[in-house]
């Protein structure tokens, strides 16, 4: 049975490998990117990667973060695509907050959340990268505005909301297009 029957997309089930990146004291984003680079290079059969990480800080105008740039490099070097949660946050003045790194990666698909009425939720962030690339690339159901996504936790089912819960649904669709339909990364991304 499906945890979220309203979101059944007919893509079937996929085997998923989880790679934990330890967030011990003293870690930094460069350590995380180094670990991602190593994990991706050691798992060349995986072409679609879901990343749920991000900075609370907003991106700077006319710049791309080092993290976003390095993820773009990893994608190019390994012929993979990253699906990245668009980061959550609300600015103190109630305005929509700009995305945080690494959601400014140009070649990744950045995912934000909408509710079940297709309305953007309050915590979704947005931003223009290098004055030209508008992020997020796509939005999907991630809970919010009173709607929730069901997930499994150690103590049972929990009701949650966030871009980190919307991104895996897009990763599924990309995996279907690349691994089942045999489309290239570029073709799948264009769809």
Region spans (language model):
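Catalytic-core regions built around general acid/base machinery
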Residues: 66-79, 101
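Subtilisin-like serine protease catalytic core
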Residues: 1-29, 77-79, 105-107, 129-135, ...
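Polar, enzyme-active/binding microenvironments
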Residues: 56-58, 62, 72-75, 181
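Active-site neighborhood of phospho(di)ester-bond hydrolases with catalytic His/Asp-centered motifs
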Residues: 50-52, 82-89, 111-112
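Solvent-exposed loop/turn segments at secondary-structure junctions
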Residues: 23-24, 55-58, 88-92, 115-118, ...
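Subtilisin-like peptidase catalytic core
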Residues: 1-63
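Extracellular S/T/G-rich loop segment that most often corresponds to the catalytic His/Ser-adjacent loop
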Residues: 97-175
């Amino acid at each position: 049975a499906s945890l979220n029957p309203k979101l059944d997309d007919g893509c079937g089930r996929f085997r998923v490998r989880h790679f934990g990146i330890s967030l011990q004291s003293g870690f930094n984003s460069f350590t995380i990117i180094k670990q991602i680079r190593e994990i991706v290079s050691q798992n060349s059969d995986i072409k679609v990667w879901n990343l749920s990480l991000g900075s609370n800080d907003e991106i700077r105008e006319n710049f791309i973060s080092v993290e976003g740039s390095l993820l773009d490099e990893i994608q190019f070097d390994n012929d993979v695509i990253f699906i990245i949660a668009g980061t959550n946050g609300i600015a103190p003045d109630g305005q929509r907050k700009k995305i945080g790194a690494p959601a400014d990666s140009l070649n990744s698909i950045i995912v934000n959340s909408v509710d079940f009425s297709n309305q953007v939720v309050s915590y979704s962030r947005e931003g223009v990268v290098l004055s030209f690339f508008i992020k997020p690339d796509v939005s999907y159901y991630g809970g919010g505005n009173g709607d929730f996504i069901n997930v499994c936790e150690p103590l049972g089912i929990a009701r949650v909301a966030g871009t980190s819960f919307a991104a895996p649904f897009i990763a599924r669709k990309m995996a279907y297009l690349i691994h089942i339909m045999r489309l290239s990364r570029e073709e799948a991304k264009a769809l």
